[in-house]
From Swiss-Prot:
Gene (name only): rbfA
Subunit structure: Monomer. Binds 30S ribosomal subunits, but not 50S ribosomal subunits or 70S ribosomes.
Compartment(s) where it occurs, according to its Swiss-Prot or TrEMBL record: Cytoplasm
Function: One of several proteins that assist in the late maturation steps of the functional core of the 30S ribosomal subunit. Associates with free 30S ribosomal subunits (but not with 30S subunits that are part of 70S ribosomes or polysomes). Required for efficient processing of 16S rRNA. May interact with the 5'-terminal helix region of 16S rRNA.
Protein name: Ribosome-binding factor A
GO cellular component, as recorded: cytosol
Length: 129
């Protein structure tokens, strides 16, 4: 059964595709390097769009990239308006997506807890076999 997509999801997907191309091809800011757009959440009235992105690097590189994207938001919005047929083009708000880092931290904590449990109860592994 096909999934029903709301208009905001379709617009968000289109904005993500267009922004990815614009950032890669048109944006000349040296602070914005290898950026991956993780997702776009568009408000119901299509007035605002949160653009989630990831970038490899240090905290300083992340801050620089965020600033570069925020400063380019007007240019990117104007270019989106030229490429998409929308009555109003959403204002762009860029947010760093740290879910991968949080997931890696949680995974490491789980691995550590399992290793500690096995170290405290080594005979339990033999009983399960």
């Amino acid at each position: 059964m096909p999934r029903d997509f709301s208009r905001t999801e379709r617009v968000g997907d289109q904005i993500q595709r267009e922004l990815a191309e614009l950032i890669r091809m048109e944006l000349k800011d040296p602070r914005v390097g290898m950026v991956t757009l993780a997702g776009v959440e568009v408000s119901r009235d299509l007035a605002h769009a949160k653009v989630w992105f990831t970038v490899l690097g240090s905290e300083q590189q992340i801050a620089d990239t965020t600033e570069g994207l925020q400063r380019a938001a007007g240019f990117l919005r104007r270019e989106l308006g030229r490429r998409m047929r929308l009555r109003t083009v959403p204002h762009l708000h860029f947010q760093y997506d740290d879910t991968q880092e949080k997931g890696a931290r949680l995974s490491a904590l789980i691995d550590k807890a399992v290793a500690e449990d096995r170290a405290q109860h080594p005979d339990d592994d033999e009983d399960r076999s």
